[in-house]
Amino acid sequence: MANIIGLIIGIIIAIPGTIMPVRKFLSLRAEKIFFSLTLIPIALFYIGFSYYYGDLSALHAEIVGLIIFTVLALLAQFMASWILVVAYVAHAAWDVLHEVYVASIGGVIPWTEVPAGYAAFCLAYDLIIAAYVYKRMRLWDEAG
């Protein structure tokens, strides 16, 4: 049930909660900047979860994830918009890995525990945003 609720909330936050107001109030250039920079706080949530659940053994993996998504966000902003599509799809995979491998992968990489339904929420949000970015990237690139 938590996953169904997570999916529904992810859809609501993505479409009427993010895409619609961003599209209405931001220019094409600002829209691209917004979606690029949004990757950074999204990745920060996992560091917060590490502290919240008191399992700092996963902190190194989460910091690496934060660095990767920050680099992807900056590359997308300054190089090619398609990188942003890849980044959001990769983040969806990152979310699913946290749900599936919450204990560890082969005992080598610890993963941060996440709230019930969070991976479903993020999967819906990230994939909807990735599809939207894909749809808009040509316009963004033409706008500069």
Q: Which positions does each model-derived feature cover?
A:
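Structural signature of hydrophobic alpha-helical transmembrane segments
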Residues: 1-13, 57-64, 120
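N-terminal signal-anchor/start-transfer transmembrane helix
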Residues: 7-26, 133
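Membrane-interface helix caps and helix-loop-helix hairpins in membrane proteins
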Residues: 25-30, 49-59, 78-79, 112
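Cytoplasmic-side transmembrane-helix entry/capping segments in multi-pass membrane proteins
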Residues: 29-39, 60-65, 84-90
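Membrane-helix boundary elements
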Residues: 37-53
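Hydrophobic alpha-helical membrane segments
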Residues: 85-103
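C-terminal membrane-adjacent module
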Residues: 98-144
